[in-house]
Amino acid sequence: MGVKRILACVECRSRNYSTKTNQQSHTDRLEMKKFCRTCNRHTLHRETK
């Protein structure tokens, strides 16, 4: 079953993206480089609690 995970920008803390992942295969926190509209550039986005 997919779990909804919200990604927040590391620099400005803006919550820009939401994804669904498999809970069993992704036990650690998700990190991706994505475009942040607030910063207007590509930054690291981490999963929030």
Swiss-Prot record:
Any one GO MF annotation of this record:
structural constituent of ribosome
Tell me the Gene Ontology biological-process terms attached to this UniProt entry: translation
What InterPro entries would the database entry show?
Answer: Ribosomal_bL33 (IPR001705), Ribosomal_bL33_sf (IPR038584), Ribosomal_zn-bd (IPR011332)
Supply the Pfam families for this chain. Answer: Ribosomal_L33
Keywords recorded for this protein, A-Z: Ribonucleoprotein, Ribosomal protein
Which cellular component terms (GO) are annotated to the entry?
cytoplasm; ribonucleoprotein complex; ribosome
The UniProt entry, under NCBIfam families, shows: PRK00504.1 (NF001764), PRK00595.1 (NF001860), rpmG_bact (TIGR01023)
Task: Name the chain's protein.
Answer: Large ribosomal subunit protein bL33
The protein's matches in HAMAP family, at most eight in alphabetical order, are given as: Ribosomal_bL33 (MF_00294)
> Record's family?
Belongs to the bacterial ribosomal protein bL33 family.
Provenance organism? Halalkalibacterium halodurans (strain ATCC BAA-125 / DSM 18197 / FERM 7344 / JCM 9153 / C-125)
